[in-house]
């Protein structure tokens, strides 16, 4: 699975009910949500075609209980590649019959198309030869269609609306990191205003951060604005300093001890945010852990004071 696919997997795992409510409402309303869905990804991996390895897809197999009293397996095949795949409908059919053949369970196949080709809308696989016919139809949702519903998505309380917006704006701002930065902040602000739980904010932030990647110089400006948002709302949910520090200090953390590596990364980022001359990484790694923590705390206090005076 590629880096771009990872946020989709996390979003579907955490917000599966919200996903169905937004994208496949009829099916959502037939599910008994008092019974938690079961993620069956391991079962799906056992029957996945070998030639699917490396494709930019996210596949989910989920068991849900229905209000009618039965159970249903849902195959969700999410296509996130930028170009249409000519064999997509066939792949949907192959997954369908492999699951039916191995598990013999009621099954619904759903497709989410994340490409940018307006006219590419596969929803059927057909084959016919001398009176023998296959006609396999499956529901699809085209994320591109939501471009006409940006305002509605921004106002929606459904967390998956933010995921779709992040996907759309990532593609709309390709090659324009400043616009992407503004959209990223625009999507983050309502999370605090709506009083979302800290866990939900962190989860959605990870999805946005994965999708809406920024170059280093603009990422630093993004961090500045994010700190302001956190301070204004008195809700430091994202802990952005620690998040970026984890990225910057991971290598050192593995070699020198995770805690030391993370603190070094925090100090480096704080020095940049404050405009200080940066201490070399080699020098920082030679400082005892307790002194590093003290230096980090002093810089954090200086940054907070600076923000209050702005």
Task: Show which residues each predicted segment covers.
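Elongated, amphipathic alpha-helical interaction scaffolds
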Residues: 1-310
